[in-house]
Curated annotation (Swiss-Prot):
Biological function: Chaperone involved in the maturation of iron-sulfur cluster-containing proteins. Has a low intrinsic ATPase activity which is markedly stimulated by HscB.
Gene3D superfamilies named in the record: 1.20.1270.10, 3.30.420.40, Actin, Chain A, domain 4, Substrate Binding Domain Of DNAk, Chain A, domain 1
One Pfam family, short name: HSP70
Protein name as annotated: Chaperone protein HscA homolog
Keywords: ATP-binding, Chaperone, Nucleotide-binding
Matches recorded under InterPro entries: ATPase_NBD (IPR043129), Heat_shock_70_CS (IPR018181), HSP70_C_sf (IPR029048), HSP70_peptide-bd_sf (IPR029047), Hsp_70_fam (IPR013126), ISC_FeS_clus_asmbl_HscA (IPR010236)
GO molecular function annotation: ATP binding; ATP hydrolysis activity; ATP-dependent protein folding chaperone; unfolded protein binding
Coiled-coil region list: none
Family: Belongs to the heat shock protein 70 family.
GO terms, biological process: iron-sulfur cluster assembly
Source organism superkingdom: Bacteria
Length: 620
């Protein structure tokens, strides 16, 4: 769906002018830029005819180097040569240091706990490093296409959370380029294959790149790409295959404590061996150690497959969960699209074929397919294809909701809801005269706030001081096409409102998302029981609060004996509500209700009598 091009009256909007826009695959290991030229989408090479740009940035006192120029020094200067920066985007320093082994970089923590890399060229963060990768890609595109870009579509893993997506946008802003849209990588691949092959039905997109794995189940129908379910792991990819080989090298060569340069040498050789074993059944690994000694080791494909087997099976488990979430079986999947350089590994293709029951699609270069899809989408968004009816419907990975009394979660937007989306729900006050309400936005599938992830907190002030339950506050959740969330609370009678845009200070890994989903399924029955208990406890508290207010105001309507009966039942309810028996609480509420029916009738009569006092029949 094209963005409207509006001109002032009397001026041409140049409807036939081709507008320049590109798609960028900002990858963990390599990045690419693609454009639609003469109706065909393809990646753009540099002056050396290289299509991919290594996602490597080196900082020195004399300047910043990107791509192959930086990669060439990764072994000699690993401390200042930053690789796979995408894995650090939106994550805390604590998370990185606990999850990543043998990192050669010098880190500092920012005020909010995010990583800062200390380099000879100054201190930089993952957003700034990512912008350095984007700069040569944008320059390449403008040089090749012969003009200034009107915008770019940048791809991100489907499981990138709000912080990671916002970081990607910020990186583009530092580059000085307009982001038309962030596009999920599997969705980009579906665009490329959908337009080329005209497929309709259920499609699985298996995306195994250098540092991330995503599985998406999509329904393609008459130009509509709808993501039914997503899954994956933001810390699993070809880099992990390399790490398994690297660990094997260290063990075989009896490398105990090793230098950063030796680690980097083994990493580089591990990647070369992995790529060689894609075509050959055996290859020779060779590394020169710090003493100048040549170390060699014969590595077979069988050995390599044994090392990575558990990792590959882990991706298949994610595929199984995604199919279950989508409500489809592998038999219903028409095609499986392979994306990412790591899908060239024969074991990966074989395991996917075994699980899906059919040979996966590899007709478009798996390294380029994401960039190609992004280019097609960029071409549409700038208005070069106004006749296109291509529609993208992505989904959110975890439910979004609000904390209510008793620590309960009221889900406002359910998991796997297509985005962009807006959902609204009404809430009310708990106490008489309440003039403010605190909102706690949470993410997750569990029934209690304690078991979900906190996203943000904000307060709505200026609520009219009415009786409990009389004020009406409308809470609206909006998730835009890039997966960013804004929450607005508005008191309906006055129009007073407060809002917040949720940009978490750091991200949530896909492993954690997977664990949250597993926990929600494993604890479903217990969670419902706990929710029912909490709901009854909240109801008991509301009844007691209301009754206390009534007694403070109208106790004179009751005799001492009547007051004693009510207070005895109130004390009983308070005691039972502090225990863990929902049925007993409900029974105690009913007993108290019965005991206060006469009191309620007397209050009603008294209110009517006061309202009619001094009124004649004619005035009524």
């Amino acid at each position: 769906m094209a963005l409207l091009q509006i001109a002032e009256p009397g001026q041409s909007a140049a409807p036939h002018q081709h507008r320049l826009a590109v798609g960028i695959d900002l990858g963990t290991t390599n990045s690419l830029v693609a454009a639609v030229r003469s109706g065909v989408a393809n990646t753009l090479p540099d002056e050396d005819s290289q299509h991919s740009l290594p996602s490597v940035v080196r900082y020195t006192q004399s300047g910043v180097f990107v791509g192959r120029e930086a990669e060439a020094f990764s072994a000699q200067d690993p401390q200042n040569t930053i690789v796979s920066v995408k894995r650090f985007m939106g994550r805390s320093l604590e998370d990185i240091q606990s999850g990543e082994q043998s990192l050669p970089y010098v880190f500092e923590a920012s005020e909010n706990g995010l990583p800062i890399f200390v380099t000879p060229n100054g201190k930089v963060n993952p957003v700034q490093i990512s912008s350095e990768i984007l700069k040569p890609l944008v320059a390449r595109a403008e040089s090749t296409l012969g003009g200034t870009l009107e915008g770019v579509v940048i791809t991100v893993p489907a499981y990138f959370d709000d912080a990671q997506r916002q970081g990607t946008k910020d990186a583009a802003s530092l580059t000085g380029v307009k982001v038309l849209r962030l596009l999920n990588e599997p969705t980009a691949a579906a665009i490329a294959y959908g337009l080329d092959s005209g497929q309709e039905g259920i499609i699985a997109v298996y995306d195994l790149g250098g540092g991330t794995f995503d599985i998406s189940i999509l329904r393609l129908n008459k130009g509509v790409f709808e993501v039914l379910a997503t899954g994956g792991d933001s810390a699993l990819g070809g880099d992990d295959f390399d790490h398994m080989l690297q660990a094997h090298f260290a063990e075989q060569w009896q490398q105990g404590a090793v230098s950063a340069s030796m680690i980097r040498k083994m990493q580089i050789e591990a990647r070369r061996v992995k790529e060689a074993l894609t075509e050959s059944s055996e290859t020779l690994a060779t590394v020169i150690d710090d003493n100048g000694t040549e170390l060699t080791l014969t590595v077979s494909r069988v050995l390599f497959e044994g090392l990575i087997s558990k990792l590959v099976k882990k991706t298949i488990s994610s595929c199984r969960r995604a199919l279950r979430d989508a409500g489809v079986s592998s038999d219903e999947v028409l095609e499986t699209v392979m994306v990412g350089g790591s899908t060239r590994v024969p074991l990966v293709r074989q395991e996917v074929e075994n699980f899906m029951g059919k040979v996966p699609l590899t007709s478009i270069d798996p390294d380029r397919v994401v960039a190609i899809g992004a280019a097609i989408q960029a071409d549409i968004l700038v208005g070069n294809k106004p006749e296109s009816d291509l529609l993208l419907l992505d989904v959110i990975p975890l439910s979004l909701g609000i904390e209510t009394m008793g620590g309960l979660v009221e889900k406002v937007v359910s998991r796997n809801t297509t985005i962009p989306v807006a959902r609204a729900q009404e809430f009310t006050t708990f106490k008489d005269g309440q003039t403010a309400m605190a909102f706690h936005v949470v993410q997750g599938e569990r029934e209690l706030v304690a078991d979900c992830r906190s996203l943000a907190r904000f307060t709505l002030q200026g609520i009219p001081p009415l009786a409990a339950g009389a004020a009406h506050i409308r809470v609206t959740f909006q998730v835009d096409a890039d997966g960013l969330l804004s929450v607005t609370a508005m008191e309906k009678s006055t129009g007073v409102q407060s809002s917040i845009q949720v940009k978490p200070s750091f991200g949530l890994s896909d492993a954690e998302i997977g664990n949250m989903l597993k926990d929600s399924m494993a604890n479903a029955k217990e969670d419902i029981t706990r929710r029912m208990l909490a709901e009854k406890q909240v109801e008991a508290a509301r009844v007691l609060e209301s009754l206390n207010a009534a007694l403070n105001k109208d106790a004179d309507l009751l005799s001492e004996d009547e007051q004693s009966v009510i207070q005895t039942n109130m004390a009983s309810l308070a005691q039972i509500a502090s225990e863990d028996d929902a049925d007993a609480i409900e029974a105690a509420i009913e007993v108290l209700d019965t005991a206060t029916q006469d009191f309620a009738a007397k209050r009603m009569d008294n209110s009517i009598r006061l309202a009619l006092k001094g009124q004649s029949v004619d005035n009524i």
